[in-house]
Each structure stands twice: as structure tokens, then as C-alpha cells.
Amino acid sequence: MNRHERLLEELKAYVAADAAEETHRRAMVGLLASTDAFSRAHFMPGHFTASCYIVDGQGRLLLHHHRRLDRWLQMGGHVERDETPSLAALREVAEESGLADLHFPGGAGAETGIFDLDIHAIPAGKGEPDHHHFDVRYVARTRTPDAIAIDRAESNELAWVSLDRAAELMPGPESHRVIRKIRERSPF
């Protein structure tokens, strides 16, 4: 099964937490059916990305202050050629935070399931027009939270924060939905 087929199967089986997330799920299914949805050069309506919320043993989240967007976010980025979204999410976290000790909850395998879905606007920059990221989101745990190392090309700062502080730093409803899910499904 190729990554398009695998993601399509996962999206069709995914149960959204609310109406907004269901709208995102349906749009993602449509994008997969109609385009080269993983291509970074596909701007209308956008392309798939992957991100990951990292939780430590104290229930804190690792956030980074994104250099270009000037916002606190989870780590993530583009899905490379022949890479699944879940593996892309782990790769991006490792590149942006230095953390290699990352585990999806519930098992050692990399394909353990989507945690959240979001579609968000990306402003023009780096020679790219305004477009949307169709973000497939995961949650993973680390046992080595002190091993973080900032990538200054991507981040102004890395910080382990409580879920309450994360909700303050990331005030959007999509972030609050993820934080609510993390609270409901803990411990990780």
C-alpha cells in the first residue's frame, strides 16, 4: 500500500472530535483524491504537512517559537518523497529539537494513528504564494526531555510548558482541541 492509499484509509477511518475537524478530514480526503497532495509545489489549495506534539513524563508539551511565523507551535513540516506523515512528523521533531527518543503512545511502531487534523493558512514567503497546509498531527512521548537542542534556523526558542501554559501560548481553537484531547487521553 502506498502512502496515498494508507493515508486515505486512515483518514476515512478517523473519527473527528468536532465539526471543524470533520470539515478538515473531508477536505483532506478530497485533496488526496484529486492532486499530488504531498508535493511542496502544489499550492492550490495546498499540500499535506505533518506535525507532532511532544509530551514528557511530567505531562508537559515541547513547543517552539517559530522564527518565520513568530508564533509558538508544535514542531512539524513537509512530508518528503516516499515518507509517510507519521515518519515525517518524527523526523521534523528530531531535526528541530534534537530529540531522538520519541515514541508514539500504544506501541513501538511508527504507524500508530492520527491524533488530530487541521488546515491552516500559510502566508507568502520564501518564493511561495499564500497557501494552506493540510496538517496531519500526531502525539509522541520522550523520556529524555533534557536532550533538546534548538535549531536556530527554525526556532527562536524551545520550551517545555504545562498544558495550561500551552493553551495561553497557542490560543486558537485548533490548539485548544489538541490540548483537550491530550488531557483526556493522558497519560502518554
PLM regions with names:
Residues 13-51:
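Acidic, metal-coordinating catalytic segment for phosphate/diphosphate chemistry
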Residues 55-57, 61-91:
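Glycine-rich active-site/cofactor-binding loop and its immediate structural neighborhood
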Residues 4-15:
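Generic N-terminal amphipathic, Lys/Arg-enriched alpha-helix
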Residues 170-188:
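Charged phosphate-binding loop/patch that engages nucleotide di/tri-phosphates or the phosphate backbone
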Residues 80-174:
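Unchanged
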Residues 51-53, 60, 137-139:
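Residues embedded in well-ordered beta-strands
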Residues 45-49, 67-69, 74, 131-135:
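Short connector loops at helix/strand junctions that flank enzyme active sites
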